[in-house]
Amino acid sequence: MLRFTEEHEWLKLDGEIATVGITSHAAEQLGDLVFVELPKVGAVLTKGEAAAVVESVKAASDVYAPLDGEVTEINEAVVAAPETVNADPQGAGWLYRMRLKDPSAMEALMDEAAYAAFPK
């Protein structure tokens, strides 16, 4: 199941673990990323809380926790090579994985069609 937030994050659910990243639109708006700061594994995140930071030559932007849960893994590759997020934001450029407190809460987020129609 793939879902999107109004803050331009995406989540892909596999069991109770969601992979989280920024959308292609967000990556394009930011421009070339030069720095990525990710949450610590084990961090407990609350929906809407700043979970990560992506910084480009134009601006720094918080990436918000899309739902409540605990960080289970981070993508060290994007810390070492932030440009990976620009090249493949919804693939190799994922940011972190989290165990969702309530996986059914994803239903309230936008699906691909709703996100495509969402004003950018």
Curated annotation (Swiss-Prot):
Annotated SUPFAM superfamilies: Single hybrid motif (SSF51230)
One protein family per Pfam: GCV_H
Keywords tagged on the record: Lipoyl
Names of the cofactor(s): (R)-lipoate
Residues bearing the modification N6-lipoyllysine: K58
Domain called Lipoyl-binding: residue spans: 17-99
Highest taxon of the lineage: Bacteria
Assembly, per entry: The glycine cleavage system is composed of four proteins: P, T, L and H.
NCBIfam families tied to this protein: gcvH, PRK01202.1
Family per record: Belongs to the GcvH family.
Name of this chain's protein: Glycine cleavage system H protein
Name of the coding gene: gcvH
